[in-house]
Each structure stands twice: as structure tokens, then as C-alpha cells.
């Protein structure tokens, strides 16, 4: 049948032309599909949820409020204060500040393999910011991912989550932004190669990964649960880092909060699984972690999460943090295959005596640890004053050291820790300038073997890639 069909000749010139048209149509479709597939890879590169005021009172309930109260020209002090709190919850300052002397003025470069995105100015400057935006413009950007000029926004701006935020809350944020000092600053233009500079292609990404619509409270759940769900799914956009990506670089809805790696840092599993996730954490543990960035003897925030704590979650009310904890406890458990909890590994070192007086080898992990790390973490790895929030933490029973992947440990050695909260200032210096890739790998592998998960390790090549991942 196939052979006979292949020998059939067109009836005439018209039929030949029809075949050519069909072939061209198929080629166009295939080309468009190829462009979309390549473009989808770009979408994996999201802005960091990075980055001081007193902690604000709890905001209003989850349910939608009258959008008319958000008019910028008539914003009340209460509305502005509420908007500031919500802007903290959304960590707006993180991506929209490249220079602390001009907060919210944008210009933060987001480097990708396909070029660089620069975040926009969202101060009320009429020429370079959003001073000429109407409330409708702002709502459309937050809820639909469409800018004032009708351009489609890149999902580095998490409109896929912000679409769930009520109109009242969006307009409260708008009212707060209108009170900022206008900064006349034009961020650099995006430098993206074709076809990644074609914003209209976002239409296809949205078809697969975006559903517009506000948060709908679950009438069967408690007010606290609904409040936590509203924050986590909306303004806090936790899934952007903690949920793996599908082939289009949208979120894998079947693996929500199961953990993912971005820019070298691994955002851990935060489902209710008692081994792989945080199902064994108490509400007090979660509140402590989000407000102070640390659960003594268990976990400490570093990298992008440390910045989220410093610039966002530490300012949320205790009531809201408890609501987040209640909601996260209900997230379905997803196992990552771990046999033990990350915070149950390790034992104190006892080899320091044999190392005293010996010549330091450039790649001996134990010797390098004693020389570079023991002053703060003690040669036993048990830390100094490790029970206090701002102390030098123990490496034993430490969730970073006990993780299946050693990425975060190597990243901390390379890039350090800088976390400022109302509880304490935590600073660990970067060793990127002092240690070579093989030395960082040696220390990392010694620490995981002695104080953490002995099955976790990094290679020199992996360290080399991690070294530039956050630069």
C-alpha cells in the first residue's frame, strides 16, 4: 500500500501546487514549533527572589475587596501601609533594585544563556517608571502579564502567581508604589538574541502554563489555611523556586514544591513528606525559619532564600507565618527517595590531632577544613554557640550538609552567607577568591562525608560551574 501510494503522480499542475502549499504549511508549523521549543528553554531563567522597616500588622482577609478603594489619587494612609506590607510579601524590591541608592528603580541584570534581561523601573517617575500607568494598566500587568503598551511580559515577573492576588490587594500595592520617591532612571534595554526577544511568543507559553484568575477560598478549610494558601500561591510565589519545571519550563503541577535547582542553588523539597520534605518540622520551626532564617540545630537560610527572609518574610506577621505553616502542612507529600532526613546525618570529627603540625596539602579536605573553617565551625564541626540564632552553626544535623545534593554547601563556601534580620546579622565570608575549584570540592566532600550525607559529593568540574552560576 505504501509503495503504491508513493508512486501515484499528481493529476496536473494544480495538484502539484496544492501539494507544495501543504508542504509549506507543514514546514511553517514545524518551524514555529521548533522556535517555541527553543524559546521555552529561555523561560527557565527566572529572576531570583532576592532582595528596612518595622514589622507591619496583619493584612486584611483573603477575600476580594472593593477595587475602588485603590485609587492612587485618594489613597488613605491605611491603604498605603497595607500596600507596603503586601509589597514586602511579594518581595518586589528584590528584582526591581540594582542599586540600593535607588530602590525600585529596576536595572537588575538577569543573565541567561540567550542574553540579559533588565528589570523595569516601578517608581512613580512619569517618564522612566510607572507614573503614567493607570490602575487598570497595573492590574493587567499583575493579573495577565501584559504591560502598559500591550507587550507580553516575561515570566521572570511571576504573573502566573500574581494573577491570584485580589484586585484590592493589587491596588493597595499600587497605592504604596505611588508614594515612593520618583527615580528618573532608565534601565538598560534587554539584550536578548532572536527569537528570544520576540515577546509575542509568550502567547504560546501562556497557553501551556498560565491560567488567569483570582484565588478562590476553599469553604471547607479554615480561615488560616485559606490565608496561607493565598500567600503561598500568590504574592510569595514559593513555587517559582521550589517546584520543578516541565519541558516548556513551566511548573510541573504534578510535583508541586518537590524541590528544584536554579542558578546553582537547590530549593529544597518543602512538601509534607516527613523524610524528604518538612513534614517533620513544627509550626514553630517554620515560623522561626521564615522570620529569622534559622532553625537552630536544623537549618539555616543561605543564598536566594536568605535574601527572601531578609527582604520579605521576616516582615510578615506571626499570624501570617503561622497560616503559611498550616497551609504547607497540607501540601501532598512527595518523596525524593531519601532514606533519612537531611538534618539527621553526621558525627563530630576526631582527626584534628593527627593533622596538627602536618604540611597542608592543596587538596586534602580535612586539612583545608581545619585551616579555613574550624575557627567558626570548630574542628569537631559542632559550631561555636550553635544554639543561638546568630551563632556559628553546627555542621552536624545540618539540613544543607545532609542533603542528597552538595550544591548548596559548595555554593555557601564559594559565595558565603549574608543574612540580616531583626534577630541577628549572619555573615560568612566568600572563599571564592581564596580557594581553587579542587580545594572547594575537597572541603565540600570532606564536610559531607564527616558531618553530613556521605553519599553526597561534588566534582571539580561541578564546582567550576557553580562558581560562575551566581555571578
Task: Tell what function each PLM region has.
Residues 74-97:
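Mature N-terminal segment immediately following signal peptide/propeptide cleavage
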